[in-house]
Regions:
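Acyl-CoA/ACP chain-elongation machinery
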Residues: 2-52, 85-99, 133-140, 158-185
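Glycine-rich, phosphate-binding/catalytic loops in enzymes
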Residues: 17-20, 80-81, 145-148
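Condensing-enzyme catalytic core mediating Claisen C-C bond formation in acyl metabolism
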Residues: 28-128
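A beta-strand-loop signature enriched in Asp, Gly, Thr, and Trp
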Residues: 85, 107-133, 140-167
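A general alpha-helical scaffold signature found inside nucleotide-binding enzyme cores
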Residues: 102-106, 145, 178
Length: 185
């Protein structure tokens, strides 16, 4: 079993993210929408549009991983398979202002594996990108660049992109689990 839970909706955590300028604040939302009366909080999180930050979420996501043979023996419904794991972080860099080479390497390795498993046509026509999508202006620019650059290299012209944080907020530690649950359904 792998997973995580976090309940970050506390004054200290909110103030920390507010100080970093990472939260979608009412004033910034109204400025984006040209409003003076009240923000449209239903549109607060906009990963790849004009945006000003994210909303915090609380969450808990746990996933059961097991050998495929055991899952079949137990008659379990299999939702997916982990073909590989790619972690090529940059350690020394500031992740918010700009992605380091590790981010590009991680996505490129995952795309190369998808191409090996699905073929060129499968990667180009039957794949999609589950974005980190925090909805901060910095993330919009850097993540968009990673996706665009690698889509070009791999010949992906029309790549559907989803970002679950736009619907559930940023749960911090469990955010990867939120993304996995969104992918597997």
């Amino acid at each position: 079993m792998v997973g995580n839970a976090e309940a970050p909706i506390t004054p200290e955590v909110i103030e920390g993210y507010r100080t970093m300028g990472a939260l979608a604040e009412d004033e910034a939302l109204m400025a984006l929408d040209g409003r003076t009366d009240a923000p449209d909080n239903r549109r607060a999180v906009r990963p790849f549009s004009d945006n000003c930050g994210f909303t915090l979420a609380e969450g808990a996501v746990y996933t059961i991983l097991m050998d495929d043979t055991l899952a079949l023996e137990l008659g379990l419904m299999i939702h997916g398979s982990v073909a590989n794991v790619f972690v090529n972080s940059d350690g020394f860099k500031k992740s918010i202002p700009g992605p380091g080479v590790g981010n590009y390497v991680t996505v490129a390795k995952a795309m190369a594996l998808a191409r090996r498993l699905l073929g060129d046509e499968g990667l180009r026509r039957r794949s999609y990108f589950q974005a980190h999508g925090t909805s901060t202006p910095q993330n919009r620019v850097t993540e968009s660049h990673i996706m665009s650059a690698l889509a070009g290299i791999f010949g992906v012209e029309d790549w559907p992109v989803a970002a679950i944080k736009a619907y559930v907020g940023h749960s911090l530690a469990p955010a990867g689990g939120d993304q996995l649950a969104a992918v597997l359904g």
